From Swiss-Prot:
Gene Ontology cellular-component terms listed: ribonucleoprotein complex; ribosome
InterPro entries: Ribosomal_eL40_arc, Ribosomal_eL40_dom, Ribosomal_eL40_sf, Ribosomal_zn-bd
Source organism of the structure: Methanocella arvoryzae (strain DSM 22066 / NBRC 105507 / MRE50)
Coiled-coil region(s): none
Protein name in UniProt: Large ribosomal subunit protein eL40
Amino acid sequence: MARFPEAEARTLNLQICRKCNARNALRATRCRKCGYEGLRPKKKELKK
């Protein structure tokens, strides 16, 4: 995980396009590169 909470929020609060794997804003509804609407939240590491 990131050292600072601000850095962690900036790198992990994203959506990933299922088609081209581009990073998109969290509030995006479609991909900025290919226009595909299948976005998923970026996976986060589980804390134990």
